[in-house]
Amino acid sequence: RNLLTWAMRLGGGPAIVPVALAAVLGVLTVRLSNDAALRPLRSALLSSVLLFAAGGVIGVFIHGSNVRIPAHYHGSIVGVTLALMGAVYRILPALGYQAPQGRMATLQPWLYGMGQLMHIIGLVWSGGYGVQRKVAGTDQVLRSTAEVAGMGLMGLGGLIAIIGGLLFVVVVLRAMRQPQAVSH
């Protein structure tokens, strides 16, 4: 068990930092070109790195069994999910569909990511007050306004993330409705 924890800390932390920095530096360099077709990809990558980093940082501060634990893995998993959303945006043209474009395609990863960031901040906040994981409703025994506010932020963030997830489906379906323009 200790070996697994050690491997997670080494592989999930220091090993990822150089890759994340390279990705962010690459995006910032590409940003100078201001190519509208790259905006949705840039949004997905930056929000992915942000959420994955938040999940990693939260993992460092886990003590005991409370809702900080699901905050950690929600951040990490959502970071990967956002990267996969960006990958879908990238491969659609290779499959013969239009590349997702426009404001909705650019804002969708940020909406999903910011909703999830609110979700995990609410969990970390409540976890700081000792709110237990794997319990719901009255069993949570939310004793203070701060605990209720943290869980409320978690719920609001979750709702925003659901809307962002549904927008991902809308963006992809719109791109798939129109075949890719053939260049001669």
Regions found by a protein language model. Name each.
Residues 50-53, 160:
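C-type cytochrome heme-c attachment and multiheme electron-transfer modules
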Residues 8-18, 73-81:
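Alpha-helical transmembrane segments
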Residues 115, 157, 170-173:
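Short, well-ordered alpha-helical packing segments
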Residues 83, 119, 161:
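Short, electropositive, low-hydrophobicity segments enriched in small/polar residues
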Residues 14-18, 146-166:
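Hydrophobic alpha-helical transmembrane segments
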Residues 52-57, 115-121:
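Aromatic-anchored segments of alpha-helical transmembrane domains
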Residues 1-7, 23-46, 57-73, 82-110, ...:
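Juxtamembrane membrane-water interface segments of multi-pass membrane proteins
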